[in-house]
């Protein structure tokens, strides 16, 4: 049982989608309690087709966070392109709290000028009713001139601005995900790739004839640690995503797996079986100095760091079934963290250190759950039968994970409050082991 669990977890826990498949979002959970907002289509001041539907990108970003419920275009009472064109009453009557308006103009040489405003509907309605000249209802206003190739990135930037102004929290829409793509029958079936968080702008970092597993981002977002079988055994490498340089970190006898970076970027928590059963170790990336953390007769696996860099959480079956435990690196004191559900595994800690996200087993089905670190209360976020490999956005608002959708492995998103769920179906092959990057700017 434990070996089956271990290899299912450390082996190839995850799933999902191709960059093109990210275009197709299937909404599987509602956001009725989210905040109503509207992103009006940006006015196109140029010839030919609009180069990028910025409003659609922003709308999708905000919807995926689970905190906002964008108004459908067909329900919009008007399509203003500036705050001065907004008739606030009909927006307010639909409960819309804020409206994003903007325009795109071609300025030549493949560059574009983009203007946008974030407008508070209630404040705007009060200002117009009282006849004042104040524009205090404009929460943010920006203008930028950018190359056409950067237009989608700028749309994510708008999403970050809107998200932060309305929630007080930093947006995570300009982040990336790393994953392993598998295309059976290809010359190099296994590929390590990165893309924008929504699957666009995909880039291949490594191609291999042998399995690749468990990518993990360094805290500065410049490197990936991962497991490779290119030499007919599991080994852990670190690769720079910009210059492609890589170094071998761990190549001991037996299993070398499940690397996770420490918050300071100097160490990796890893799993080794060089002395028998798989145990947790910490290795210094520069010196390769190795420190053993656990030493038991059962399998300890899937380490993850607490934000303080002094504590690890990990999966262990020492209590009879897989559960989450913590260990203090200085004292060695270990304690069990999870008690609900039939089993719990594959945990990571949210950036604020207040929650754990994990795979929980409920009535034989594997689902994504979040547990409060202080109270121990658990919230099951998904209702599928085989959800795996959750990875949390750097602002803690969203989780990317693997699931089965219509009989195929697919990548999925769920907000950390469970209010929004979406599946990104794959059209060919499969994607495993997604990992969400830290903030990149």
UniProtKB/Swiss-Prot annotation:
GO cellular component, one term: periplasmic space
Database matches in InterPro entries: 6-blade_b-propeller_TolB-like, PD40, Tol-Pal_TolB, TolB_N
Subunit structure: The Tol-Pal system is composed of five core proteins: the inner membrane proteins TolA, TolQ and TolR, the periplasmic protein TolB and the outer membrane protein Pal. They form a network linking the inner and outer membranes and the peptidoglycan layer.
Function noted in UniProt: Part of the Tol-Pal system, which plays a role in outer membrane invagination during cell division and is important for maintaining outer membrane integrity.
Protein name, per record: Tol-Pal system protein TolB
Database matches in HAMAP family: TolB
Superkingdom per UniProt: Bacteria
Chief localisation class: periplasm
Subcellular compartments: Periplasm
Swiss-Prot/TrEMBL keywords: Cell cycle, Cell division, Periplasm, Signal
Protein family (similarity comment): Belongs to the TolB family.
Pfam families: PD40 (PF07676), TolB_N (PF04052)
Transmembrane in keyword set: no
GO biological process: cell division; protein import
Protein species of origin: Aeromonas salmonicida (strain A449)
Record carries keyword Cell division: yes
Signal peptide residues on this chain, from the entry's feature table: 1-21
């Amino acid at each position: 049982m434990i070996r089956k669990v271990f290899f299912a977890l450390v082996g190839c826990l995850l799933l999902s989608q191709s960059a093109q498949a990210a275009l197709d979002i299937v909404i599987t959970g509602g956001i009725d309690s989210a905040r109503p907002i509207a992103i009006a289509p940006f006015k196109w001041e140029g010839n030919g087709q609009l180069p990028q539907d910025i409003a659609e990108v922003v709308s999708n970003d905000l919807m995926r966070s689970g905190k906002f419920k964008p108004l459908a275009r067909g329900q919009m009472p008007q399509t203003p392109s500036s705050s001065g064109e907004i008739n606030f009453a009909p927006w307010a009557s639909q409960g819309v709290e804020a409206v994003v308006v903007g325009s795109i103009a071609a300025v030549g040489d493949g560059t574009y000028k983009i203007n946008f405003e974030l407008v508070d509907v209630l404040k705007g309605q009060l200002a117009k009713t009282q006849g004042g000249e104040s524009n205090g209802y404009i929460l943010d206003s920006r203008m930028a001139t950018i190359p056409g190739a950067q237009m989608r990135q700028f749309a994510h930037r708008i999403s970050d601005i809107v998200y932060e102004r309305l929630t007080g929290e930093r947006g995570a829409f300009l982040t990336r995900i790393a994953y392993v793509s598998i295309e059976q029958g290809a010359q190099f079936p296994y590929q390590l790739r990165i893309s924008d968080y929504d699957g666009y702008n995909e880039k291949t970092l490594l191609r291999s004839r042998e399995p690749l597993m468990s990518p993990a981002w360094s805290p500065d977002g410049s490197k990936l640690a991962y497991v490779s079988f290119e030499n007919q055994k599991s080994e852990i490498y670190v690769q720079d995503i910009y210059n492609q340089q890589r170094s071998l970190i761990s190549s001991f006898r037996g299993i070398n797996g499940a690397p996770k970076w420490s918050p300071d970027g100097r160490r990796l928590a890893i799993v080794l079986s060089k002395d028998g059963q798989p145990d947790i170790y910490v290795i210094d990336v520069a010196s390769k100095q190795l420190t053993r953390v656990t030493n038991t007769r059962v399998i300890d696996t899937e380490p993850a760091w607490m934000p303080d860099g002094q504590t690890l959480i990990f999966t262990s079956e020492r209590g009879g079934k897989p559960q989450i435990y913590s260990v203090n690196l200085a004292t060695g004191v270990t304690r069990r963290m999870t008690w609900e559900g039939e089993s719990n595994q594959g945990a990571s800690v949210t950036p604020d250190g207040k929650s754990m996200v994990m795979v929980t087993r409920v009535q034989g089905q594997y689902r994504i759950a979040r547990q409060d670190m202080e109270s121990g209360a658990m919230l099951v976020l998904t209702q599928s039968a085989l959800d795996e490999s959750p990875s949390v956005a750097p602002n803690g608002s969203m989780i990317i994970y693997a699931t089965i959708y219509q009989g195929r492995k697919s990548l999925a998103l769920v907000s950390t409050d469970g209010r929004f769920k979406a599946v990104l179906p794959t059209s060919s092959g499969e994607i495993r082991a997604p990992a969400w990057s830290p903030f990149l700017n």
